[in-house]
């Protein structure tokens, strides 16, 4: 926008027999949305000046607003942008504990160090000190390039959003007389595509006299779908043309289940059960203790024979 850059305004002043010093003072300073006007005069010293001297004032008028200056009440201009708020993950001052558990940039656990020592080590390595677990006792912090870490997190999040909103169509081609190895390769590729959330189109091309083996091609496609199992459902198929195909759509419920990692406790219990069962199989049965022999009854004493009496 056009504006007045500078102009000179004169005035007459009468000074007689006095000494007067005029300090530098801004007579008028206004900043608005449309115009910024500043009127000022420099420091002057007059001693016994003759009447009617001409002094010059510099008037600068500029359109387009600007920073600083006086703001009228009701002026809704946007102020200067505030400093970026500190990310909570970088706010080390929020840690009340004097010690922290430190992890370096190479994923090595350095153990317990003082908070000041952790800050110093991060500064020496020219890395950011990021809070991983603020509620732990003591809190866990890590040295890393936080801007790079956030970029990778945002990129990973965008990729996940793309997968949820967009579904690509992957094509797999094979002949009716494909060998077992090539068939297994295509089967694994289809399983991977389906787990990534993409559709899979399996095509069997029939050329020339191969059309006579149409039934074999149909059985091959049915076998392929059967071995995919519950990982996908059939969306459409075409067994009439020379290029026969079947389109499989991923089953979201079956895809989510493998992504849930088993907890350590479950893994340990499974290992314990397996080891216990193996021990039961390999362990020999302990011999039963032999019964103790019953004590034999003591023989009763024989009665003494009565003495014979002989009559004389």
Swiss-Prot record:
Q: Name one GO molecular function term.
A: mRNA binding
Disordered: region residues: 253-312
Where along the chain is composition biased (Basic and acidic residues)?
A: 253-263
Where is there biased composition of kind Acidic residues? 283-305
* Subcellular location field: Plastid, Chloroplast
Which is a Gene Ontology cellular component entry for this protein?
chloroplast
Q: What is its main location?
A: plastid
PROSITE patterns according to UniProt: IF3
Consequences of knocking out this gene: Chloroplast development defect, and leaf developmental abnormalities, such as virescent and serrated leaf phenotype, disorganized mesophyll cells, and altered cotyledon venation patterns.
The record's similarity note reads: Belongs to the IF-3 family.
Q: What does this protein do?
A: Chloroplast translation initiation factor that is essential for the coordination of leaf and chloroplast development. IF-3 binds to the 30S ribosomal subunit and shifts the equilibrium between 70S ribosomes and their 50S and 30S subunits in favor of the free subunits, thus enhancing the availability of 30S subunits on which protein synthesis initiation begins.
- Can you say what this protein is called? Translation initiation factor IF3-2, chloroplastic
Question: Which organism is the protein's source?
Answer: Arabidopsis thaliana
Lineage summary = Eukaryota, Viridiplantae, Streptophyta, Embryophyta, Tracheophyta
| Name of the gene encoding the protein in the UniProt record | IF3-2
């Amino acid at each position: 926008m056009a504006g007045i850059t500078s102009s000179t305004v004169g005035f007459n002043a009468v000074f007689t027999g006095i000494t007067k010093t005029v300090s530098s003072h801004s007579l008028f300073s206004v900043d608005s949305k449309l115009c910024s006007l500043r009127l000022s005069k420099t420091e002057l010293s007059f001693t016994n000046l003759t009447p009617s001297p001409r002094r010059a004032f510099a008037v600068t008028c500029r359109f387009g607003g600007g920073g600083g200056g006086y703001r009228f009440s009701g002026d809704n201009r946007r102020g200067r942008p505030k400093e970026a708020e500190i990310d909570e993950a970088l706010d080390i001052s929020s840690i009340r504990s004097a010690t922290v558990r430190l992890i370096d940039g190479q994923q090595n656990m350095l153990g317990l160090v003082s908070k000041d020592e952790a800050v110093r080590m991060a500064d020496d390595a020219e890395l950011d000190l990021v809070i991983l677990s603020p509620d732990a006792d003591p809190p866990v912090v890590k040295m890393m390039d936080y801007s790079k870490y956030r970029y990778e997190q945002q990129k990973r999040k965008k990729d996940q959003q793309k997968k949820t909103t967009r579904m690509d169509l992957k094509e797999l081609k094979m002949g009716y007389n494909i060998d077992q190895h090539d068939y297994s390769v295509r089967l694994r590729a289809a399983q991977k595509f389906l787990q990534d959330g993409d559709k899979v189109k399996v095509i069997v091309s029939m050329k020339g006299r191969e059309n006579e083996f149409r039934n074999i091609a149909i059985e091959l496609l049915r076998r392929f779908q059967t071995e995919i199992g519950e990982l996908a459902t059939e969306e459409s198929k075409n067994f009439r043309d020379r290029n026969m195909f079947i389109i499989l759509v991923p089953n979201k419920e079956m895809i989510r289940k493998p992504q849930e990692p088993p907890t350590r406790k479950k893994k340990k219990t499974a290992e314990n059960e397996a080891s216990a069962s193996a021990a039961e199989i390999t362990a020999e049965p302990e011999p039963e203790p032999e019964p103790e022999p019953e004590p034999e009854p003591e023989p009763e004493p024989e009665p003494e024979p009565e003495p014979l009496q002989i009559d004389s």
